[in-house]
């Protein structure tokens, strides 16, 4: 699907989820400004006790296409919304930055970041569970993507620059 159409659909989904979320961001290839989009990735922090309501809202969006909503406490997948899959990743304040970074991609960029993290004594958790000091097995408090790049000794890259 072309990016312009995907952005419109992503914004439709986000408008449904906005009342239920403290914070959200459209991620993936849309955020990287790729011309073609295979799916819609959204990262959100639900308001207190709103996870079930988010799933219910996605199920309402799924009905016209007889699509399904699957997943659990950290990830929900809407199999089809007007012809495109929607993946909703559930974060909290501690996992927001790494989950947004990882779900923005690209896959090759994430691999390079994970390699760099290991080189400097960290583990960048692909599931978005944070940046971990390997020697102490403790998460590093990072709240922005910029902080993650800084911890890894790298200059920040805008999402559109994260293709490898």
What are these regions (language model features)?
Residues 11-50:
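Active-site nucleotide-donor binding segment shared across nucleotidyl transfer reactions
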Residues 2-5, 50-164:
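Acidic, metal-coordinating catalytic segment for phosphate/diphosphate chemistry
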Residues 1, 26-27, 34, 117-119:
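Helix-hairpin-helix
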